[in-house]
UniProtKB/Swiss-Prot annotation:
InterPro entries in UniProt: Mdm12 (IPR027532), SMP_LBD (IPR031468)
Chief place of localization: mitochondrion
Notes on the domains: The SMP-LTD domain is a barrel-like domain that can bind various types of glycerophospholipids in its interior and mediate their transfer between two adjacent bilayers.
GN (gene name): MDM12
Cellular component terms per the entry's GO annotation: endoplasmic reticulum membrane; ERMES complex
Name used for this protein in its record: Mitochondrial distribution and morphology protein 12
Protein family membership: Belongs to the MDM12 family.
Organism listed in the record: Candida albicans (strain SC5314 / ATCC MYA-2876) (Yeast)
Annotated Basic and acidic residues bias: 81-96, 412-428
Annotated function: Component of the ERMES/MDM complex, which serves as a molecular tether to connect the endoplasmic reticulum (ER) and mitochondria. Components of this complex are involved in the control of mitochondrial shape and protein biogenesis, and function in nonvesicular lipid trafficking between the ER and mitochondria. MDM12 is required for the interaction of the ER-resident membrane protein MMM1 and the outer mitochondrial membrane-resident beta-barrel protein MDM10.
Keywords: Endoplasmic reticulum, Lipid transport, Lipid-binding, Membrane, Mitochondrion, Mitochondrion outer membrane, Transport
HAMAP family, sorted: Mdm12
Membrane topology: Peripheral membrane protein
Length: 428
């Protein structure tokens, strides 16, 4: 199933381009720059006129993590009014990068109810029953669209049939939560290519409770439980983008020999030909839209095995293509940006300066991928709050009503004044 995107609605107004430019500029300013560059800034951003190809792979209920985010935001607002000692963290400011998931530690110190211990035990039993109800054995394995790890084997649905829960996967890297260990053993393939009846909400696929290295903190029963609305919906989509989006950056290249900052050379960098082919989730709940990239699609580009570089020119024309599947540099579970081209404008310089330009380009490409991974790759996401528009409309309506009421009062006052004037003239 696929649908068309009215891309022109995004490009007519330059507000979105300006917002993204400011966001990227702020992110680049927050990173630590190497000694050979300074004053990095994003000068221009444009979405382009070519929309991405979007294919719907699955329709179901939103992940529970999205509801937890809304609840945590609500608890945060209450905590800010009562006390600032609550250790709550907003997911919109970025999740805990070290833990690898978006659950927050909630410190609830209310001691009003003396029977909370019994309620906690009952709640734990209900949580265990809920996990059993979402057994992954009900999800059928379909067509394998993604190839996360050639050395690992994807378990079939039959392998889970005799057990109440799937076996624990061995972590690929003990020092961090690799996304392979979350997705691959539990079959994101089954979401993408499932053909039979299965669980309508495959949230356990991304449930970190199955990881041996991590344990989700228990949410206090005093917190409000997630409220599911009948209109809530989630789409698992395949996004294939090969458009004309471009980013312009300005940076100073430093030559630190024979002394630090001996030469400062401004360089203009034009980032174009961005290629994205990934699986993402788009969830709509309570007038909020959540977007998160889950994993990359394994394409078979003929020139993906090696970096391609065109001959550089001493006149400043420097074109370099960067690909994301170089085994020596790419060990992340997701890159989002698969291919990117950078054109640099530096004028007539020596060859040793050109070599430093290559370092700058590679640094910027890696930092751009890191920003996208940290901000919009699972377990991070971006949330677009649609309630702000409703609030603005309500304020406009109230303002119009107030203006209309004042106008009526002015009209009545005018009539009353005219009457008095007539009486005065008649008396005279």
């Amino acid at each position: 199933m696929s649908f068309d995107i009215n891309w022109n609605q995004l490009t007519i107004d330059d507000t979105i381009n300006q917002s993204i430019k400011e966001f990227l500029d702020q992110q680049f300013k927050n990173i630590s720059l190497p000694s050979f560059i300074s004053n990095l800034a994003v000068t221009d951003f444009n979405l382009g006129e070519i929309p991405p190809e979007v294919t719907i792979r699955h329709i179901g209920d939103p992940f529970e993590e999205f509801y937890e985010d809304e609840n945590n935001l609500g608890v945060m607002n209450e905590a800010n009014n009562d006390s600032k000692d609550e250790h709550l963290k907003n997911h919109g400011d970025g999740i805990n990068k070290d833990s690898g998931y978006n659950s927050q530690n909630l410190d609830d110190e209310d001691e009003d109810d003396e029977d909370d211990d019994e309620d906690d035990e009952d709640e734990e039993e209900e949580d265990e029953d809920d996990y059993d109800d979402h057994d992954l054995g009900t999800i059928n394995e379909g067509i394998s669209l993604l190839n996360f790890n050639e050395n690992s084997t994807t378990p079939s649905a039959n392998s889970f049939a005799g057990s109440a829960a799937p076996p624990l996967p061995p972590p690929l890297n003990p020092s961090r939560d690799s996304f392979h260990s979350i997705l691959h053993p539990y079959g994101v393939n089954s979401i993408i290519g499932a053909t039979g009846a299965g669980s309508e909400t495959p949230t356990n696929i991304l449930n970190q409770n199955y990881l041996s290295s991590r344990v989700l903190p228990k949410i206090s029963v005093k917190q409000k439980q997630p409220h599911h609305d009948d209109n809530d919906i989630q789409l698992i989509v395949e996004i294939n983008y090969k458009g004309d989006m471009h980013i312009n950056l300005l940076v100073n290249l430093l030559v630190n020999y024979p002394s630090p900052n001996f030469i400062s050379l401004p360089i203009k960098l034009h980032i174009t030909d961005i290629v994205i082919h990934s699986i993402a989730t788009i969830a709509y709940l309570k007038k909020s839209v959540f977007l998160s990239f889950l994993c990359d699609v394994d394409d078979t580009f003929p020139d993906f095995d090696s970096n391609v570089q065109t001959p550089t020119s001493t006149t400043g024309g420097n074109f370099v293509d960067y690909y994301s599947n170089d085994a020596t540099i790419n060990k992340e579970r997701i890159d989002i940006v698969k291919k990117i081209k950078i054109e640099s404008e530096i004028g007539e310089v020596e060859n040793n300066i050109l070599r430093n330009v290559g370092k700058v380009e590679k640094f910027l490409v890696e930092q751009l991928r890191n920003i996208l991974r940290d901000e919009i790759a699972w377990p991070s996401w971006i949330c677009i709050d649609m309630n702000d528009d409703d609030d603005e409309e309500e304020e406009e309506e109230e303002s119009e009503d107030n203006d209309g009421g004042n106008s009526d009062l002015n009209d009545n006052d005018g009539k009353h004044g005219d009457g008095r004037t007539d009486e005065t003239e008649a008396g005279e």
